[in-house]
Amino acid sequence: MTQFIEGKWVEGLGHEVTSINPANQKVIWNSKTATPEQVGVAVDAARNAQFDWFMLGFDARLAIVEAYRDQLEANKAEMAEVIAQETGKPQWETATEAGAMIGKIGLSVAAYHKRTGTSENDTPAGRAVLRHKPHGVVAVFGPYNFPGHLPNGHIVPALLAGNTVVFKPSELTPKVAELMLKLWEKAGLPKGVINLVQGEVETGKALAAHPQIDGLFFTGSSRTGHILHQQYAGDPGKILALEMGGNNPLIIKDVADTKAAVHDIIQSAYISAGQRCTCARRLYVEKGAAGDALLEQLVAAVKQIQVGPWNAQPQPFMGSMISETAAKGMVEAQRNLVNLGGNALVELTHLEVGTGLVSPGLIDVTGVIELPDEEYFGPLLQVVRYSDFDEAIKLANATRYGLSAGILADSREDYDYFLARIRAGIVNWNKQITGASGAAPFGGVGASGNHRASAFYAADYCAYPVASVEADAVSLPATLSPGLSI
């Protein structure tokens, strides 16, 4: 019983699917997919529940959301372990994800009041009142890299605003989604307010195409996001929020503490086995002795990165990629870059057949003319040597994406120069570019999104503004308009 529809756990009626631990290939979850017909039932359940959920009022909705927060707190160790087993990420990292899920509640409440909520002002024309109302039924598509935290960042603000939700998680991380819904159930969520449909492409297509959803919130690949954007292009009445990937640049310029710089480069490129949408994919290092020395330190440090299963002791820095298929894809990406003229400074290798375990890779692609503008979603960092700061910024901007970017530089003037010219929604200075605050918006431009930043700004796409001019009774104005006699 792995579909949660109208407040009940039911069996999927589609084909059988399994979820495996990518570090050892053990099956940790199996069930059947939701059929398009079951997706329709889930949407109907959300539609039937939506008005009553909205009319409960914010305080009553908040009480249930806070009860969910308490369930997360009580079960955070289990949540972290399930995420670790299903994604292959090491336990230290999934503990931070479980913690972020808890922290998202307070941030979402603050965002609701600051970004939406209700306000009023007296004007000569009457009382001007600004309110926000929910869109209705929204679909949430979750990714596999942060299977708890990222969909949580859509679901919580959507519910606070008064929407109901149909949640379709990644088919690679169904067990995390199942645990999330069990905690919502324990929190006392009314039936139909969240509905979980587990499945693969057929399930997702049925949900995205359903005429009764009022919005879709997606986190995932640029390819899928662009398909959804095309699908919704002729339907302006539906809100679409896309958070996609990036081919993210990191520039190094005149840094005295090279050891700290190497640390921030590694945290930017290799955390989560390179499976964060904000991970650095391109590293720009100045030509000359200083750049040579930094690269030498980086090569040595990358070779020392510990890789291992989610539960290895002592804990590794990098766990498994999400699947053996993903691991093989990174080996192939490296091979393609070498064939184009790249030089592997540290070779990315598939460490164990049948698993997603790979070693981190570092490849010098300086001078490669036809460098693909691709998001290689794994631990492979491309190095480009530059002679001129303007050249480095120009190369950094030479991408259709625009999610994250950063510079490590001791000079504030260099940062200001970079900040004014770089094209990205997240721009960091002397910090890893995978570091983002839930108290700030999260999103990018270009192929990285559709101008619907998430995190603190998720409240913006979960409700629409309603402007009213009000008076307690009808009354004649002191002076009638010319030409009127009443």
Swiss-Prot record:
Residues at the active site: E243, C277
PROSITE patterns found in the cross-reference section: ALDEHYDE_DEHYDR_CYS, ALDEHYDE_DEHYDR_GLU
Catalysis performed (reactions): N-succinyl-L-glutamate 5-semialdehyde + NAD(+) + H2O = N-succinyl-L-glutamate + NADH + 2 H(+)
Any one GO biological process: arginine catabolic process to glutamate
Domain of life: Bacteria
UniProt binding sites for NAD(+): G220, S221, S222, R223, T224, G225
Coiled-coil region: none
Alphabetical keyword list: Arginine metabolism, NAD, Oxidoreductase
EC number(s) stated in the UniProt entry for this protein: 1.2.1.71
Major enzyme class: oxidoreductase
Pfam name, any one: Aldedh
Pathway: Amino-acid degradation; L-arginine degradation via AST pathway; L-glutamate and succinate from L-arginine: step 4/5
Residues annotated as transmembrane: none
GO molecular-function terms, A-Z: succinylglutamate-semialdehyde dehydrogenase activity
NCBIfam families tied to this protein: arg_catab_astD, PRK09457.1
Its biological purpose: Catalyzes the NAD-dependent reduction of succinylglutamate semialdehyde into succinylglutamate.
Stored HAMAP family: Aldedh_AstD
Entry's family note: Belongs to the aldehyde dehydrogenase family. AstD subfamily.
Name of the protein described by the UniProt record: N-succinylglutamate 5-semialdehyde dehydrogenase
Gene designation per UniProt: astD
